[in-house]
Amino acid sequence: MAAIELIDLKKNYGPVPAVKGINLTVADGEMIVLVGPSGCGKSTLLRMIAGLEVISSGHLRISGNDVGHVDPADRNIAMVFQNYALYPHMTVRQNLEYGLKNRRVPRHEINRRIADAADILEIGEFLERRPRQLSGGQRQRVAMGRAIVRDPAAFLFDEPLSNLDAKLRVRMRVEIRRLQRQLKTTSLYVTHDQLEAMTLADRLVVMNGGRIEQIGTPVEVYRRPETVFVAGFIGSPPMNLIDLDELGPSDRAFPRDTDLVGIRPGAINLGAGSAHDLRFDAHVELIETVGDENNVHLRIDDSRKRIIASVPTDRHLRESDRISCHVRMEALHPFNKSTGRRTDRSR
């Protein structure tokens, strides 16, 4: 196991900056998830740590050693890819032992590591099969097994579940989290799927445009997004972002420079509320039933701003209904559009 430090890490492709001065410390045994939209730099950053991309500037330290210019094979890191990267002509056992044989690990040690990995991942019955004889989930477990047998200082996961169907992704998320906790190996995991990120991470690193927008536990990032981007990216349905002048009056003042308000769909309550609440009237345009909740698409009166409210299905609404809504002031997220940041920084 090892701590990983990224110090002002940058990556340029010619004149184009892709990763813009990343500073991050991953504690020994921690699971960090890098999450963000396509093109935000998260996979490039992971490949820089792995040594598959040359670092333009900055420092990368693993266990206190600067490894920015060390060959990938000598960084003691194991990577799990989206496409499994298994040799199709080899059996599962041969795939697991291939890297160890190249490193001249003794045969008895190879056998021990394969047996341990097969036991942890429950792939013992597949050892003599070839990848084409396995399901997608089984192939991904073999790919993780190949990483485990290396006994690395850290795991790097590059969107490993993207090729799996929704049901299998849920199961594999649980397996990866269980495995990481069991092995206590420092891990960095890249995904664009926020649900995957929220369920796996000890801490989230939300990226956008090659920069870090926010670092925090999943609960911290969800409850208190620090930027407009994070507010709109984390959460499903996403947070409603509304210009302050599009909302009705309230007897409570917002922090200075607030001109944009974020409201989680679940924070919108039906009914008039009290004078202390933020209140507005709206028309129901569309109702989506999602399990025990309805995502109700609303158009705020006068402003014509469209928002989403999540309400229980036992609240009987019809499209074209006109309803009153209220939000507790404590549930509002105040932002400034120019800076893109919260205005209640001291709270």
UniProtKB/Swiss-Prot annotation:
GO molecular function list = ABC-type glycerol-3-phosphate transporter activity; ATP binding; ATP hydrolysis activity
Q: Where is the ABC transporter domain?
A: 4-234
Subunit structure comment from the entry: The complex is composed of two ATP-binding proteins (UgpC), two transmembrane proteins (UgpA and UgpE) and a solute-binding protein (UgpB).
UniProt-annotated binding residues for ATP: G36, P37, S38, G39, C40, G41, K42, S43
Repeat as a keyword of this entry, yes or no, is no
Membrane topology field: Peripheral membrane protein
User: What keywords does the record list, in alphabetical order?
Assistant: ATP-binding, Cell inner membrane, Cell membrane, Membrane, Nucleotide-binding, Sugar transport, Translocase, Transport
Q: Name one GO cellular component term.
A: ATP-binding cassette (ABC) transporter complex, substrate-binding subunit-containing
Q: What is its EC number?
A: 7.6.2.10
Query: What is known about what this protein does?
Result: Part of the ABC transporter complex UgpBAEC involved in sn-glycerol-3-phosphate (G3P) import. Responsible for energy coupling to the transport system.
Which family would the database say this protein is a member of? Belongs to the ABC transporter superfamily. sn-glycerol-3-phosphate importer (TC 3.A.1.1.3) family.
Name the InterPro entries on file.
AAA+_ATPase, ABC_transporter-like_ATP-bd, ABC_transporter-like_CS, ABC_transpr_MalK-like, ABC_transpr_MalK/UgpC-like, Mo/tungstate-bd_C_term_dom, NA-bd_OB-fold, P-loop_NTPase
Can you name this protein?
Answer: sn-glycerol-3-phosphate import ATP-binding protein UgpC 1
Where is this protein primarily located?
membrane
* Native organism: Rhizobium etli (strain ATCC 51251 / DSM 11541 / JCM 21823 / NBRC 15573 / CFN 42)
Compartments where found: Cell inner membrane
**Which cysteines does the record link by disulfide bonds?**
none
Instruction: Say if the entry is tagged with keyword Transport.
Output: yes
Q: Where are the transmembrane segments?
A: none
User: What biological-process terms (Gene Ontology) are attached?
Assistant: carbohydrate transport; glycerophosphodiester transmembrane transport
Known catalytic reactions: sn-glycerol 3-phosphate(out) + ATP + H2O = sn-glycerol 3-phosphate(in) + ADP + phosphate + H(+)
